[in-house]
Design a protein with these regions (language model features):
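A glycosyltransferase accessory/donor-loop signature
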Residues: 1, 10, 26, 33-40, ...
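Hydrophobic targeting segments
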Residues: 2-5, 22
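N-terminal beta1-alpha1 ligand-phosphate binding loop
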Residues: 4-16
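Short, acidic, metal-binding catalytic loop of nucleotide-sugar glycosyltransferases
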Residues: 21-29
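Active-site-proximal specificity loops/subdomain of glycosyltransferases
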Residues: 31-67
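Short, surface-exposed amphipathic charged segments that create phosphate/polyanion-binding patches used
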Residues: 45-52, 114-119, 183-185
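GT-A fold catalytic core of metal-dependent nucleotide-sugar glycosyltransferases
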Residues: 60-109, 133
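Conserved catalytic core of nucleotide-sugar-dependent glycosyltransferases
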Residues: 93-155
Length: 227
């Protein structure tokens, strides 16, 4: 299983705990960071620095098929995820008729700001791109131009026809602070997404599921997984 996680220098601990949470439930998972400085050095990314981007991986996530040599399936997720079930269950949902599969959220942010005081920009299909199961060999990705397309075109999957964009269960991109009121009585999250900021930020240290994240953090330290 090939897994890429967006890396931001301000969220080092979030990345490490996300990585640990994946491998806790699936020890043979291959987890790699997408670091903007590295993909620039590789010549894969040459966009100007976007001062409005909330994270360093805002657009580099769409390099996942290229980083995977356009072979097989890859999972991308933001670093503010905490996996509490085996990610293999997610890969088992991969359907080759789709170019990519996502949780198709329908929600509006509660605030104009998000993690670390960043501006919250509303747009269609918001948060769909925070977790993507990529079919790297699908012909649609020939039209994916990470350096040339606008941020809106990328985050709204404009290079993929609607019929080629599959849907994943909401449990795998559980928006912390949003979905408990809607779904908690009938569904249990499989992967928590601290989309407005997690316990690693002072201003959101007491968010929902903060104790669970800290539990994984302590386990991560004990297992010498954080460097």
């Amino acid at each position: 299983m090939n897994i890429w996680v967006g890396y931001d220098t301000r969220e080092h601990w979030a990345f490490k705990v996300c990585d640990y949470s994946i491998r806790k439930h699936r020890p043979d998972a291959i987890v790699k960071p997408i670091e903007q400085r590295n993909v620039r050095l590789l010549g894969l990314y040459d966009r100007p620095v976007d001062e409005n981007a909330s994270t360093e991986f805002s657009l580099t996530r769409f390099l996942t098929p290229a980083l995977s040599n356009f072979k097989g399936w890859s999972l991308y997720c933001d670093c503010d995820f905490l996996f509490i079930e085996d990610v293999k269950d997610l890969f088992d949902m991969a359907d080759p008729k789709y170019a990519a599969m996502v949780v198709k959220h329908d929600y509006k942010p509660k605030s104009n700001t998000k993690m670390d005081g960043q501006i919250q920009f509303p747009y269609p299909r918001k948060n769909w791109s925070s977790l993507i199961l990529f079919n790297n060999e699908h012909p649609s990705h020939k039209f994916l131009d990470v350096n040339g397309m606008t941020p809106a075109e990328l985050h709204q999957f404009d290079w993929i026809a609607d019929k080629d964009l599959g849907e994943l269960p909401v449990e795998w991109n559980w928006l912390v602070g949003y979905y408990d009121d809607l779904w908690r009585t009938v569904l249990d999250p499989s992967a928590l997404h601290y989309t407005d900021g997690g316990p690693w930020f002072e201003e959101t240290k007491d968010c929902d599921y903060s104790d669970l994240w800290r539990q994984y953090y302590e386990e991560c330290l004990d297992a010498n997984k954080v460097f």
